[in-house]
Amino acid sequence: MGKQGSPRSPRPETIDKEEKFGRRSLDSLSGNDLLLGRRIYASEVSKAQGSKHDQSSGSSNKFWKKQHSWLRRNFKSIVLMISVTGFIFCMDSIMVSIFHSDSRAVVQDISRLSNMTLHKNGAVDASPVQMYSRLLNLASDSLAKNEFKPDTPNFREERSSKSSQWKPCADNNKAAVALERSRELSNGYIMVSANGGLNQQRVAICNAVAVAALLNATLVLPRFLYSNVWKDPSQFGDIYQEDHFIEYLKDEVNIVKNLPQHLKSTDNKNLSLVTDTELVKEATPVDYIEHVLPLLKKYGMVHLFGYGNRLGFDPLPFDVQRLRCKCNFHALKFAPKIQEAGSLLVKRIRRFKTSRSRLEEALLGESMVKSTVKGEEEPLKYLALHLRFEEDMVAYSLCDFGGGEAERKELQAYREDHFPLLLKRLKKSKPVSPEELRKTGKCPLTPEEATLVLAGLGFKRKTYIYLAGSQIYGGSSRMLPLTRLYPNIATKETLLTPQELAPFKNFSSQLAALDFIACIASDVFAMTDSGSQLSSLVSGFRNYYGNGQAPTLRPNKKRLAAILSDSETIKWKIFEDRVRKMVEEGQKLRTRPYGRSIYRQPRCPECMCKF
């Protein structure tokens, strides 16, 4: 149809219905056709008689007799035809009415389903919460305009060419000479019970290796404490390769699978117990020498219970620091079943092709997909996004996420159930407003904010995204901004069959290992919380093995909050420029600053060699 007022769509004139049909019949029919299949109006007869004044009245009577005779002969057929036509018309009207009714119902059902999701407890989500509707509309328009434009490099490699000058070398055995220990000189055994999830436990393992070397002790293969949060009974051998771990570090640290029988008495364990409250966070070597070594020598063992991030990064002897890197990047290999599932996961993301990068080789070993693929088509490139927007994190932040009074009540109830110490501490301190928390970068990014960052960086709608993370607070309604702008989203649950996931069911740490693999192997890794342990370890692996071609996108939450504070007025082009500058600043090549995590930033002489 044309636009209103155009020549193609003239406004119809009102005409008399009878006059219209009469004129059309007279103009279009001629001769005896006037008599067929329709009733003759008196006005037409009068006109016909006037126009044919040369005909006699006898002829007129004859004409009427023929007409009446024809009507009598065909009366039943005419009635039948009218009845059938009427019946068809009625049925058509009924079917159209039913179709439209069903269509409206389906549309309404889809709308309700898109605006609601079920929590595990059966409660229904409210309508989708959008804090930046205007920017989302601008982002959608921008994605539509750029969809068919040529692809750009688009943050698919690190900004500095000097990043490729750093090469992995923590496994250099020549440096291990200084840490060689004989079994006769061991000061005793160190037992470790690590807390937390997969990533916290990984850090605890490598810290324990460093402490064992520092105190000249024999390390008993670490145990993992059962957590009411993670609810995973997995132990070391369920997640990592025990024999490889022991063999790889044998020249620097003595590691055994079990404590000797003569040291297993309950009294001995209790007397030598050191809890995490007795060691300060990021303790120094002096702390261990003064508080742990005496117990080790006295009882022949020490039990570090609830162990985690209890060893600082500086000051620390060069070789002990290097040993941490060797543990994290070389000695800890995932168990074969995790490697195989991780290999299958990456294989399906890349559409049965493999990039065969050193990253994938380090992660997957012999399980890496080695199948050759005909043709010159490259493996599918993908972005891995780690969303940290779980209910516990959201509640603990004390921030406002646009859900109004219902959201505030829900999060307060969660805090009362899970964080009583937080509430107790808040009563004794000066309150900080949610607005101030957001302004200072203390609030976790929502899926909506993550979507705007990706769009601002120029990632196209067709971008393939692997989504890592736990249950998102708000469910699918919170995810709508992301899923609407970037529909090509996959998770381990959508890429692997229920049968393939079955061995990992109820083992959250093993499932997290699959996310760990998919994130490290990705072409681009984007995080929403730089403080997360998974993001820290993943970015460290990518720095160590990536050869400058494994970029990590790390938004500065404080700067992003300042950008989004202008959401109602800012132009999209300006928004893009500011977001790009923010991310580029975080991608600048840096060697590890003093005191910073060697797991996140391994570019330093202790872990890597510069050529």
Curated annotation (Swiss-Prot):
Glycan-linked positions: 115, 216, 270, 506
GO molecular function list: glycosyltransferase activity
One GO cellular component term: membrane
Regions of compositional bias (Basic and acidic residues) in chain numbering: 10-26
Pathway given in the UniProt record: Glycan metabolism
UniProt-annotated location(s): Membrane
Residues bound to substrate: 386-388
Region listing for Disordered, in residue ranges: 1-29
GO biological process, any: fucose metabolic process
UniProtKB keywords: Carbohydrate metabolism, Fucose metabolism, Glycoprotein, Glycosyltransferase, Membrane, Signal-anchor, Transferase, Transmembrane, Transmembrane helix
Keyword Glycoprotein applies: yes
Stated name of the protein: O-fucosyltransferase 8
Organism: Arabidopsis thaliana (Mouse-ear cress)
Gene from which the chain derives: OFUT8
